[in-house]
Amino acid sequence: MAVSESWTKKYLAEVLGTFVLVFLGDSFVAFAVAGAGGNGFKAGLLGAGFFWGFAVTLAIYACGAVSGAHLNPAVTLSLAWRRGFPWSKVPGYIGSQIVGAFIAAMGVSFVWNGIIVHYEVASKIVSRGDPNGVTSGLIFWANWPHPGLVGYTGDYLTQDPWWRGAGTEIIITAILVICILGIVEDRMPSAANLAPIAIGFVVAALVGLFAPIEMASLNPARDIGPRIWGLLIGYGSNAIPGQNFNLWVTTGMPLIGGPLGAWIYDFFIHQHLPAPVGPDTVPVAESARARA
């Protein structure tokens, strides 16, 4: 399929792709936290990793042929810095990703509202803006530290200091971008149509392993878009700026980790790859290369 040269179509494709990603991912979290009688966390964090990875794969297939399926401001910044993506288009892509995530949060709130409310009643959440309201808020956005595991009052913040959450987010987002650039590397023989599956596996591994620390945001749009929606439906400061201003960890740190990962990949791998020669070298399709 030919990639459209219309940037408007690319922006709309990013909206759609990010919607698919966040709607499917957050729907699983809603099931895991609020499902099964409101007892919460029925499917576990490994299940969350699997479904978020699956959501990434489907989202890339959904919009990659038009927009390249960045789906993530950290990826867009990385491609602009290291792969020649136009800087003038970065705000449009990031804005589209945030809009898609915001609409997805609205959709999750609509579809799962009854179950979420039942969970809040069972958990004695009187107001979503109260400290314990953060446990239903994590359905929509990432949170440092993970309130479902370490709690939301007392000394839970000292048990998991900010620098650990920030460092974790930088490291895992760097790993994400390193793997993406390797998967879609155009100087290595590669099956372009399998790139979305491979990228989905990367996300599944990172979320499954590191969500216990700070829910493995990896994606500023996936975080800030639903937080804006949360602000509108009563979560107050639990949404923005988050308890102990944790938004800067889950939204801000991936913007450092992504470009850092791109630089690391180029320094250690990309510059050392041989130039493609001969008919046996199969370049990755443009759509897959941009999917990063």
Predicted regions and their residues:
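Membrane-interface helix-loop junctions and terminal tails of multi-pass membrane proteins
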Residues: 1-292
